[in-house]
């Protein structure tokens, strides 16, 4: 069985790119904490947008989709889910809301992980909701010719309970080591969780919820204001490449966590960049309203819709947003579904 050991994070032999990304993210986080105290209304608006984008993005990665209008209605509680996909979406909403609102009261444990899975899958009627898999599973991919191949063989169902116990204990041991940067520990734990693949379904979505939770516990709350899940969805090919690279040799303890760590930190860095740009745009009171609309779109890392612009800039009317030259904005290929 794989040995869960994060002591390499204490050895000071990390790639320069990882060290630099960590330092930059830490600096961004400090700036955000300072801004948040004196700009609560702005952060409240950003939180509303991120909540919808997180539910949409995390489910879209798994092919669980509906219209943008329906997602917003479900996330805002304005409509009950109408089909299986919408029940999956509503379940993710419930689990996400619990992490956002109750992370201070929760601890990383097997019971917590099982509870998050149960909350996420309960509405969709999963037979094994909140329970580990009872049969072995495989991670497969389909090539352009429709042929399947095994991408990774997770831990067997028989060994899943022990593996999850060892994962949690290894996390606790590393978390309590003052020489280990907690931010670097998170992607290592998430990679191991995905290699165990403890559930019959929902592992990817649970991994993203756990990422947000562990970020909260380590003092990083950017995922509340910019969707971490949507960043992954926007670059999912690179995400899966990093995941595969870091899982090679996992069962024999010969894998390297570095590629997945770099990908995780890069996504987090993009979240902070997006937060910084959105804050600067919303806070740019000296700009004309049309200029603020343009800056919102052009500074956005991800495509942004008209409705989202109106949410980001609540003092700008929808008619003003529509009056902006979309021809100019489309040239930058960042405006989505106006």
Whereabouts are the PLM-identified features?
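FIC/Doc superfamily catalytic core
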Residues: 1-333
């Amino acid at each position: 069985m794989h040995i869960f050991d994060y002591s390499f994070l204490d050895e000071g032999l990390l790639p320069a790119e990882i060290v630099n990304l960590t330092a930059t993210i830490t600096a961004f986080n400090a700036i955000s904490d300072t801004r948040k105290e004196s700009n609560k209304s702005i952060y409240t608006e950003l939180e509303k947008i991120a909540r919808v984008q997180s539910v949409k993005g995390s489910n879209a990665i798994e092919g669980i989709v509906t219209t943008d209008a329906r997602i917003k209605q479900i996330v805002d509680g304005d409509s009950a889910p109408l089909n299986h996909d919408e029940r999956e979406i509503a379940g993710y909403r419930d689990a996400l809301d619990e992490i956002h609102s109750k992370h201070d009261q929760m601890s990383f444990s097997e019971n917590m992980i099982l509870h998050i899975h149960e909350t996420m899958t309960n509405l969709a009627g999963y037979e094994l909701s909140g329970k580990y898999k009872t049969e072995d599973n495989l991670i497969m991919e389909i090539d352009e010719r429709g042929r399947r191949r095994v991408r990774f063989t997770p831990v067997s169902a028989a060994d899943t309970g022990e593996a999850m116990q060892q994962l949690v204990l290894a996390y606790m041991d590393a978390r309590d080591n003052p020489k280990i940067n907690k931010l670097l520990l998170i992607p290592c734990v998430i990679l191991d969780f995905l290699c165990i693949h403890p559930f019959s379904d929902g592992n990817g979505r649970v991994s993203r919820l756990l990422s947000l939770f562990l970020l909260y516990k380590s003092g990083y709350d950017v995922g509340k204001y910019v969707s971490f899940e949507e960043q992954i969805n926007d670059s999912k090919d690179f995400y899966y490449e990093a995941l595969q690279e870091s899982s090679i040799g996992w069962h024999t303890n010969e894998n390297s966590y570095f590629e997945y760590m770099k990908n995780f930190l890069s996504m987090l860095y993009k979240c902070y960049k997006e937060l910084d740009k959105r804050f600067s745009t919303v806070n740019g009171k000296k700009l004309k309203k049309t200029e603020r609309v343009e800056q919102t779109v052009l500074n956005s890392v991800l495509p942004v819709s008209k409705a989202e612009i109106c949410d980001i800039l609540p003092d700008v009317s929808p008619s003003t947003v529509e009056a902006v030259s979309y021809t100019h904005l489309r040239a930058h290929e960042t405006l989505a579904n106006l």
